[in-house]
C-alpha cells in the first residue's frame, strides 16, 4: 500500500518501501529480479548504505547505479502531453465492456489497447443484490474469468499427467469444483470404472485394530500435539501429549 504508516515517515524508509515493492512486482510479473537499481547520487559518497536500503536490497544481484536524474526522464522531456480528456467519470453512449480486474486473482477477461475514443471506467461492487444492467454484466464477467479462462492450463496439465481432482486443485491453486469439471471432461479418466469410497478397517474384538492420528491443540503448549488412539472395536479413545508430531 502507498499509504504512509506514520504522519512523518523518513524519506529513506519510503525509498526502501518503494524498492521492495518494485522487486516484488518484478518477480510477480516477469519472474526475475530487477537488473538495475538507480539510487540518489549522494549515496555514492556514503561508506555504507542505510539499514533500510540494505534490507530492501537483500539478495539483489543486479547493478547499482547512482545518478541525480534517471536517463528515462531525459527521453520524456520532448514528449508532447495531450490535454484531451480520455477518461470520464460517467457512462458514455457506446459499447459496454465488462472485465475482471481483481488484484487478488490476477485474471483479466478483456484487455483494451490502442484506445482512441474517450472511455468511462466504472467499478461495480461484487456480490451486490441490487438488480440492474451493470450488476448482471459484472456477474457474467466474473463467471467467465473464473472458469473458462482459467481451465486452459489445467486441462493441458491433466491431459498430460491425468492428475486427480484433489492433486489438480493443489497444483494449480484452483477450486475443487473447477478441478472436478476438468477431470470429468477427460475421456480417458471417465472410461475406467470409478473407485468406490474407502472404508476404514475395524477390529472384531477389543485391542484388535487401533488407529492413531496427531492433532494440534495450541492451548496445551509447549506440548501441544496430541496422539489420539482409537480402538476400532470398543471405540475407546486414548490421548497422550507430545512436543512434536513425529
UniProtKB/Swiss-Prot annotation:
Residue ranges annotated for the Integrase catalytic domain, each copy included: 202-246
Keywords, comma-separated and alphabetical: Endonuclease, Hydrolase, Metal-binding, Nuclease, Nucleotidyltransferase, RNA-directed DNA polymerase, Transferase, Zinc, Zinc-finger
InterPro entries: Integrase-like_N, Integrase_cat-core, Integrase_Zn-bd_dom_N, RNaseH_sf
Chain positions recorded as Zn(2+) binding sites: 158, 162, 186, 189
A GO molecular function held by the record: RNA-directed DNA polymerase activity
Keyword Oxidoreductase tagged: no
Leading EC class: transferase
Zinc finger (Integrase-type): 149-190
Protein name, entry field: Retrovirus-related Pol polyprotein
Native species: Gallus gallus (Chicken)
